[in-house]
């Protein structure tokens, strides 16, 4: 069965998997990729991309309201046709998943549709057939986490998968979880016309990001009409008289037409198959080294399945690294400077340490904090986007970047520059000396660096 034998087999066609398959093929490998659902994984089909189409629609509604201020229109009244919103989302998803399929075909990758799992150290079972490979890359991805409370299986409780297919707008939407997905979808459904409430068990939103960013985002969401409740735990979901209620530990009760459960994701280890006790795991995640090797040397694990950083852009690099090593290379993934973005309205983006982390490592006296508000940036003002700021955390002794945090309209695009500079080991002082285009949002980063150095031009003198 020579046609069933490959140099590299990849289980899972998400960001890590399809990149791994393409890279291995580029290096001359005979490659097979198994996908049980649709190419592109959670990111393209049920996560990153679909949510951004919803957010673009929400941004357009926001722009219509702002157009009154700019003298473009007189009547800002809007209504949302959810069927068309979903159809647009589906169109974008089809374009991208179709593009992934075309890329795989152009590189000669064999794609097998079906659920695959290891049946031996060099064997994969799929659809009643057995495939063999010299090296195997596991890219099983992750699944939405469910919290064990009474009523969690109520039909009105949705994950991000189901809510992105809603054809009718809920009047009252309660989001359990104030992380990335929860905040992003809150910023979509509120402009659509839903009354949105976010309930977060910890003391702040986006708990893994800089505390000041979290506080700024909370304040902004509340200002936009979103009800934000932190340090509140849901104890039960119950249907009463045809309505759905969430009961909270503090004794309060929330009514909802739909409930979005957004409390994180857990790894999907089903692809381990008969090797589930052979391949080393810890806390439900496959253990890998920096080259993505598992405890079985010719088997690799990339993306969410290893739990290192559950981000699509890290999955891309992990998949590429695993593929190069599967083809005989010696590559590692450096996760020192990975940007994180929340596509809320306004956006949030970070790279490096949070302020709390930097203080814990170096002490408050060793640091200088530079900040520059978009309200003092000409480009932001002319675009009607004055909200937010750039924050630079500097280790004073070496003028070294510890972290950069951005809250504002273009944060996700702007974070690439500080990420590149930190990877290149450029200093805050050197960045403050760089000429940035004027007028541009990116000037705010340069000015924040200048503020950290004590020489920001476009802020009043500190006394």
Write out the residue ranges for each language-model feature.
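Beta1/beta-strand and adjacent pyrophosphate-binding region of the FAD-binding site
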Residues: 2-14, 169-179
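Glycine-rich flavin
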Residues: 2-6, 22-29, 34-169, 197, ...
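Flexible, glycine-rich terminal cap/loop adjacent to redox cofactors
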Residues: 9-13, 25-37, 42, 49, ...
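N-terminal Rossmann-fold NAD(P) dinucleotide-binding loop
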Residues: 17, 182-183
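Gly/Ala-rich phosphate-binding loop of Rossmann-like dinucleotide-binding domains
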Residues: 21, 25, 186, 190-191
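A structural signal for the hydrophobic beta-strands that form the central parallel beta-sheet
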Residues: 111, 138, 159, 228-230, ...
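Glycine-/small-residue-rich beta->alpha transition segments that form the dinucleotide
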Residues: 133-135, 139-145, 256-269, 305
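Short FAD-binding loop at a beta-strand-to-alpha-helix junction that anchors the flavin cofactor
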Residues: 290-309, 398
């Amino acid at each position: 069965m020579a046609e069933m034998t490959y140099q590299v087999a990849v289980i899972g066609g998400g960001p890590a998997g399809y990149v791994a398959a393409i890279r291995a093929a580029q290096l001359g490998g005979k490659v097979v990729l198994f996908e049980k659902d649709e190419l592109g994984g959670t990111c393209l089909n049920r996560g990153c991309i679909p949510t951004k189409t919803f957010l673009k629609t929400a941004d357009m509604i926001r722009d219509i309201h702002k157009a009154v201020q700019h003298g473009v229109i007189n009547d800002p009244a809007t209504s949302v046709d959810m069927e068309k919103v979903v159809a647009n989302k589906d169109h974008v998803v089809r374009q991208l998943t179709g593009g992934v399929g075309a890329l795989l075909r152009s590189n000669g990758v064999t794609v097998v549709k079906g659920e695959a799992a290891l049946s031996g150290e060099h064997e994969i079972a799929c659809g009643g057939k057995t495939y063999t490979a010299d090296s195997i890359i596991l890219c099983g991805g992750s699944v939405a986490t469910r919290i064990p409370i009474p009523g969690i299986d109520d039909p009105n409780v949705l994950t991000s998968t189901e809510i992105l297919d809603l054809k009718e707008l809920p009047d009252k939407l309660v989001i359990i979880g104030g992380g990335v997905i929860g905040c992003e979808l809150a910023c979509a459904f509120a402009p659509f016309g839903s009354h949105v409430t976010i309930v977060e068990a910890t003391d702040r939103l986006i708990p893994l990001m800089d505390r000041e960013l979290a506080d700024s985002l909370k304040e902004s969401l509340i200002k936009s009409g979103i009800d934000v409740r932190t340090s509140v735990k849901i104890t039960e979901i119950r249907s009463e008289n045809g309505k759905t209620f969430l009961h909270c530990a503090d004794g309060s009760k929330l009514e909802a037409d739909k409930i979005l459960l957004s409390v994180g994701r857990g790894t999907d280890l089903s692809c381990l198959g008969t090797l589930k006790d052979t391949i080393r795991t810890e806390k439900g995640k496959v253990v890998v080294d920096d080259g993505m090797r598992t405890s079985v040397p010719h088997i690799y694990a990339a993306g969410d399945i290893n739990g290192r950083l559950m981000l699509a852009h890290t999955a891309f690099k992990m998949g590429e690294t695993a593929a190069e090593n599967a083809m005989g290379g010696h590559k590692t993934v450096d996760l020192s400077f990975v940007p994180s973005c929340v596509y809320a309205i306004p956006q949030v983006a970070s790279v490096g340490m949070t302020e709390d982390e930097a203080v814990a490592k170096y002490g408050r006296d060793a640091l200088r904090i530079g900040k520059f508000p978009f309200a003092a940036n000409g480009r932001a003002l002319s675009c009607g986007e004055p909200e937010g700021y750039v924050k630079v955390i500097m280790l004073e002794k070496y003028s070294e970047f510890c972290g950069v945090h951005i809250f504002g309209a273009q944060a996700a695009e702007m974070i690439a520059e500080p990420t590149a500079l930190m990877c290149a080991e450029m200093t805050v002082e050197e960045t403050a000396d760089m000429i940035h285009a004027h007028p541009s949002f990116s000037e705010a980063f340069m000015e924040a660096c200048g503020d950290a150095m004590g020489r920001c031009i476009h802020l009043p003198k500190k006394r």
